[in-house]
């Protein structure tokens, strides 16, 4: 067979081996196995002259090759009208320069140059603007299959997502893989750990649009916003209880409709698991609920006349937090700065003689709040429980915030600075009290005389003059006084230090260790000896 010559012989790369067409090009070009990476989307031209001897008289031919994988060389690929194979088959046809290759039909999006959308999970076709396979379409057709529901076998939890069910199952197994790096806190969900870390960083990203309230949890913000929106629920016909959030109210029982309440025995009284110290006459400060008042009178009994309200512990009536010196400028309704700002923004608060529209009220004092955790924290002022203790001194408090503020006494940190003078302190309440020196404001006024002052401690000390109480007694002589400063000054007469001992000073928040129990008077509310004595004995930390 005569050899075929080319005017411009070119080397063709075959299976990674370079073959010269002039020496070894014995077969037609269709028998070559060309590399796919060389021929992707490319056309190879073979320019041939007329053969000298007999042969085919074709001049120029254009041959096209489509991209094919290594393992799919036999048979036709789906979507292509012709097969790709080296074997002759009756179903194929010869390709020439004049023949046109039929292209598969394109969608309307591909004709405009757009990429096809995701495939339908039911029929596998491309999804468009409308339903792809007629399922659930406006023109009828079979309805879409229902979405899968993943349900818990241990409770009524149901979800559309399996990941939610796996996360929920950790609540039953007790697994808590997410742990805090600063404290022993652990949780089964990452979102809870993220919310917990804000307690260490102090971040409060959720802010109320109606008042300066800010918090670190979206749930707390939604609960707070219920104080701005919506009227309170109707009061209870028996005790006047109200709720801030609309809740289904229990229909009154037949005995309540008749106006008679069943009398319970003393053994059936439901009391909180707290060691309550109820002063004589304390029942006069209970809310106007007959049931609570009856229980309070059974606890308190009958005694002397009630003491003035100012002798009660200075706690915020909005959140239950114990107030420091300089806080609570409103007499009879002492409030912390955050609750006062909330009240200025339109939050209604209950009066000192009843819970008002607040759902959780203390049965031993006029304290009322919207939140049950605030009431539980407030009850520690009555029980005398102080779980938070300082590691460097005997100081203890019922609130963690007070302990953090006290620790600045040991560290010497003073983050609060006066903008008008070089004064700096470690307590925001002290800075506010110092600011009254520049402004001359005296918000604390006596209700029995014209006395006014700029510190709540001075007003408490002044009220002892009206009651005649002198709680500070000398253990050496019969000297008594109502002022802690006078008591320390008197101890110098006996050669003792400022706290009653040689060279010692009283730590803040506790009585001198050598003083007998008679040093402090036991008259008045027990809460005065537990919480109010700290304000009478020494300045706040």
UniProtKB/Swiss-Prot annotation:
Annotated region described as Disordered, given as residue ranges: 1-118, 492-541
Zn finger (C2H2-type) location: 150-172, 178-200, 206-228, 360-382, 388-410, 416-438, 444-466, 472-494
Alphabetically ordered keywords of this record: DNA-binding, Metal-binding, Nucleus, Phosphoprotein, Repeat, Transcription, Transcription regulation, Zinc, Zinc-finger
Biased composition (Basic and acidic residues): 103-115
Residues where Phosphoserine is found: 85, 96
GO BP field: retina development in camera-type eye
SUPFAM superfamilies for this protein: beta-beta-alpha zinc fingers
One Gene Ontology cellular component annotation held by this UniProt entry: nucleus
Residues in coiled coil: none
Comp. bias regions, Acidic residues: 44-55
Tissue: Widely expressed. In the eye, expression is greatest in the retina and least in the lens and cornea.
Location within or outside the cell: Nucleus
PROSITE patterns per UniProt: ZINC_FINGER_C2H2_1 (PS00028), ZINC_FINGER_C2H2_2 (PS50157)
Gene Ontology terms for molecular function: transcription cis-regulatory region binding; zinc ion binding
PANTHER family on file: ZINC FINGER PROTEIN, ZINC FINGER PROTEIN 845-LIKE
Subunit structure: Binds DNA. Can associate with the proximal promoter regions of PAX6 and SP4, and their known targets including ARR3, RHO, OPN1MW2 and OPN1SW.
Main function: Transcriptional regulator that plays a role in retinal development and maintenance.
Family, as annotated: Belongs to the krueppel C2H2-type zinc-finger protein family.
Protein name: Zinc finger protein 513
Organism taxonomic ancestry: Eukaryota, Metazoa, Chordata, Craniata, Vertebrata
Gene: Znf513
